[in-house]
Amino acid sequence: GSIGVFAATIAFFVYRAFGSMMFGPTATASHVLVKDRARAEALKAEIEADVAGGAPLRAKFARVAEQHSTCPSAKKGGELGAFKPGQMVKEFDAVVFSGEIGAVLGPVDTQFGSHLILVTDREEAKK
């Protein structure tokens, strides 16, 4: 039910806030969180079709996040801001810190549901 979604969302942000704060690479990303993989795959196909038809990727991704994502970040078009490894769940981190920048990645399944991820920037570790 909705209590479970609320608890999972709170856990996600608590994990983010108190995760590793070490120096390291930083990524900036947006995501769409939905309950199941089939829904995520359908939304990814919709995004890719619209972009192939000339729609700007970031704007389309943000619209899909606002309309379909169950994460509170939906209000900001799915934007998660900048974060370091260890601030997100490991399945999410693995994709964000290795996947292509500027492409729709996923679906990535975590304990929260199925994510589509758009990495908008990544900086290597500061020396």
Predicted regions and their residues:
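Proteostasis/folding factors centered on peptidyl-prolyl cis-trans isomerases
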Residues: S2-R37, E91-K126
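Second-shell loop/turn segments in exported
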Residues: A29-L33, E41-G53, E79-A82, A103
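A general structural signal for well-ordered alpha-helical packing
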Residues: A40, K44, F61-A62, D93
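A generic "cationic amphipathic patch" detector
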Residues: A45, G77-G78, D109, K126
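Peptidyl-prolyl cis-trans isomerase
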Residues: A49-E91
